[in-house]
Curated annotation (Swiss-Prot):
This is Serine-arginine protein 55. Essential for development. May have a critical role in splicing or in controlling alternative splice site use of at least some pre-mRNA in vivo. Not required for all splicing. May play a general role in the condensation or decondensation of chromatin. Residues 215-263, 271-283 have a biased composition (Basic residues). PANTHER family: RIBONUCLEOPROTEIN RB97D (PTHR48038), SPLICING FACTOR, ARGININE_SERINE-RICH 1-RELATED (PTHR48038:SF3). Residues 73-114, 185-376 are annotated as: Disordered. One of its GO terms (molecular function) is mRNA binding. Its main location: nucleus. Pfam families: RRM_1 (PF00076). Residues 4-74, 120-193 form the RRM domain. The lineage of its organism: Eukaryota, Metazoa, Ecdysozoa, Arthropoda, Hexapoda. The modification Phosphoserine is found at residue 165.
Amino acid sequence: MVGSRVYVGGLPYGVRERDLERFFKGYGRTRDILIKNGYGFVEFEDYRDADDAVYELNGKELLGERVVVEPARGTARGSNRDRYDDRYGGRRGGGGGRYNEKNKNSRSSSRYGPPLRTEYRLIVENLSSRVSWQDLKDYMRQAGEVTYADAHKQRRNEGVVEFASLSDMKTAIEKLDDTELNGRRIHLVEDRRGGRSGGGGGSGRGRSRSSSSRSRSRSRRRSRSRRSSHSRSKSRSRSKSRGGRSKSKSPVKSRSRSRSRSNKSRDVSKSKSKSHSRTRSRSPKRERDSRSRSRSVSKRESRSRSRSKSIHRDSRSRPPTVSFKSSFYKFTTMPFFCSDRSASAENKSRSRSRSRSASPKNGNASPDRNNESMDD
């Protein structure tokens, strides 16, 4: 069956039919799987399942290798060139590509080909979830040439359709707006933000923007970056020249000022550090002196207090009889004994003084007396 066969390229070494069955599982029933050296073919029962598989699995990894999933055209034994010519043949409205008169009116041949993005875009609202992008594209061909179609990719129950010309887009709005598609009435709204990146499209492989839009965006970015870099370089050169001029005018003054300021700051920091160190060094000495003085004073006070306490204790510990005895001796014995002792002492002193005074006189008088005795 034409259109239900899929080409799988870039298969890893040692791949089996089971691997391909798992890879394509969920996209419909498969009729046949054929594996060759590095590539293979998978045939589905329905061509819609084949289109969905191409749309979703192209560029995915199989056993660690990225594979190419494309719709197969012609015989499997044909060369890649023959498959390329057959695959991209068809009407321009079916997505662009090579024009072929034989397949001009064939519906299946117009389904494949790279998408052509345009600015004439319509947003299809209230789209049934059972409607695929292929169904939407076929339905919109009633108004004109459809270059791109997508369904349920950005939002659910919403599709995108792009036309080849403005007139085709307007006829689609007039003719197909508020019509019923698969049980739902669709609404067509013009999207003035045309050129958005979308997936899928006419061939199932066109998920990137067209080359023209890419080249335009790249050229604009490059021009903007060049302008910004040019303006930045100009501003930098101006700032550098101004800075160089201002610096070249008075380099000596600025250096001398900076040196003097640095020296002043160093002197101030040194003086501050010295004063802090002096105060720190003096303060412990003062504290030590005050502590030693307070200790010595406290020791002296404690000593004097202990002495006074000991004296007071001694005075308290002495018996009162001593005082009575001393007073008794003073008042009773002193009159009797002191008079005799004093009289004897006085007599002794008198006799001594007389003997001292009389001894030289007697010595001087002794020769006279002797002489007198001799005369007699």
